[in-house]
């Protein structure tokens, strides 16, 4: 993904005010009207607007910072609208607005991220009211803006005469007033409807990644918005995820660690045999290359790390105690005398 901070020439810790200031300066510098016929300047102008569209939105910026935002797509008219709104405080030209973007969650299993998986998501979006055809009721043209939805004023700038179009304060930019309100949608023109969409979750997706589904947001006069699906990975009963790597905590008994053992560890594609060498200590790690999740760009897979945790028994049979005391004597380790803890407990009971 592009480095939007570098495009605007700001640091990753930049405030919203600093981002806005940098955007205005660069947008004016590379505006096509200032650079007629310059294709490079035109591309820079698009990049600058694209970067600002993401970094000026706190939710999109947070997702971008975590690397969880898919590359957005913007129509050229959206970028020019953004320029006029941010630089001059007005929209460049009037057209029916798109519906709002929506966000929902899609839950996946860890195994789903190995090869990718198709998932069905249920969510609710706004669609035109069938009772009134999306009009909200019986409409009459607004007398203030004569049905245009905007009022115009003119000002001079270094671009020449700039026509400032602002939303009509009487009809709030709609261009009409409601003579009668539709009872089904209460004049809103849209009603909620439960939808289903099937999406393909790519391999290796991170927790919290935003998966963009174009055209599945709320429906508006200018077309639908987009649906963003936030990836939620259900916890695995045995494996922990650390980026593309997986971690399995293997509990070994004292005898297994000292003498070595052949064990089986769980993997995403089935059990994996593992030979534990004699003398393995607590905290040792065995790296099984290729046992993790897919790496970005098809560069193979991460590592399954098996972390050894020694399981010290809390209770021993008399025979096991005798064998351990014999071992301690053999290697010269000092241990508590036999019956010491029982005598100590009895002392405190008195």
Curated annotation (Swiss-Prot):
Pfam families: DnaJ (PF00226), DnaJ_C (PF01556), DnaJ_CXXCXGXG (PF00684). Homodimer. Its main location: cytoplasm. One of its GO terms (cellular component) is cytoplasm. One of its GO terms (biological process) is response to heat. PANTHER family: CHAPERONE PROTEIN DNAJ (PTHR43096:SF48), DNAJ HOMOLOG 1, MITOCHONDRIAL-RELATED (PTHR43096). InterPro entries: DnaJ (IPR012724), DnaJ_C (IPR002939), DnaJ_domain (IPR001623), DnaJ_domain_CS (IPR018253), HSP40/DnaJ_pept-bd (IPR008971), HSP_DnaJ_Cys-rich_dom (IPR001305), HSP_DnaJ_Cys-rich_dom_sf (IPR036410), J_dom_sf (IPR036869). A zinc finger (CR-type) spans 116-194. Residues 3-68 form the J domain. This is Chaperone protein DnaJ. The gene is dnaJ. SMART domains: DnaJ. GO terms for molecular function: ATP binding; heat shock protein binding; unfolded protein binding; zinc ion binding. Its cofactor is Zn(2+). Keywords: Chaperone, Cytoplasm, DNA replication, Metal-binding, Repeat, Stress response, Zinc, Zinc-finger. It comes from Thermus thermophilus (strain ATCC BAA-163 / DSM 7039 / HB27).
């Amino acid at each position: 993904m592009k480095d939007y901070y570098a495009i605007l020439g700001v640091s990753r810790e930049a405030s919203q005010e600093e981002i806005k200031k940098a955007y205005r300066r660069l947008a004016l510098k590379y505006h096509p009207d200032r650079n007629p016929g310059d294709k490079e300047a035109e591309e820079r102008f698009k990049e600058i607007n694209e970067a600002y569209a993401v970094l000026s939105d706190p939710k999109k910026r947070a997702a971008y910072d975590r690397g969880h935002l898919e590359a957005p797509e913007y129509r050229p008219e959206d970028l020019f609208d953004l320029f006029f709104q941010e630089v001059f405080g007005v929209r460049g030209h009037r057209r029916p607005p798109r519906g709002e973007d929506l966000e929902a969650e899609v839950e996946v299993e860890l195994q789903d991220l190995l090869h990718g998986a198709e998932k069905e998501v249920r969510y609710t979006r706004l669609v035109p009211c069938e009772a009134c055809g999306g009009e909200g009721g019986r409409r009459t043209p607004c007398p203030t803006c004569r049905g245009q939805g905007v009022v115009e004023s003119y000002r001079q700038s270094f671009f020449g005469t700039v026509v400032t179009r602002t939303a009509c304060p009487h009809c709030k930019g709609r261009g009409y007033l409601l003579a009668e309100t539709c009872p089904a949608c209460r004049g809103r023109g849209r009603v909620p409807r439960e939808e289903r969409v099937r999406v393909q979750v790519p391999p290796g997706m991170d927790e919290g990644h935003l998966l963009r589904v174009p055209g599945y947001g709320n429906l508006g006069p200018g077309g639908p918005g987009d649906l963003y699906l936030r990836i939620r990975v259900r916890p695995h009963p045995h494996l922990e995820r650390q980026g593309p790597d997986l971690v399995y905590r293997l509990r070994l008994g004292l005898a297994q660690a000292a003498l070595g053992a052949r064990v089986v560890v769980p993997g995403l594609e089935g059990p994996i045999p593992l030979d534990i060498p004699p003398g393995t200590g607590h905290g040792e790690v065995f790296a099984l290359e290729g046992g993790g999740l897919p790496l970005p760009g098809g560069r193979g897979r991460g590592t399954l790390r098996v972390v050894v945790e020694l399981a010290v028994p809390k209770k021993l049979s008399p025979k096991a105690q005798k064998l351990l005391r014999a071992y301690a004597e053999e290697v010269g380790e000092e241990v508590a005398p036999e019956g010491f803890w029982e005598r100590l407990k009895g002392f405190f009971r008195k």
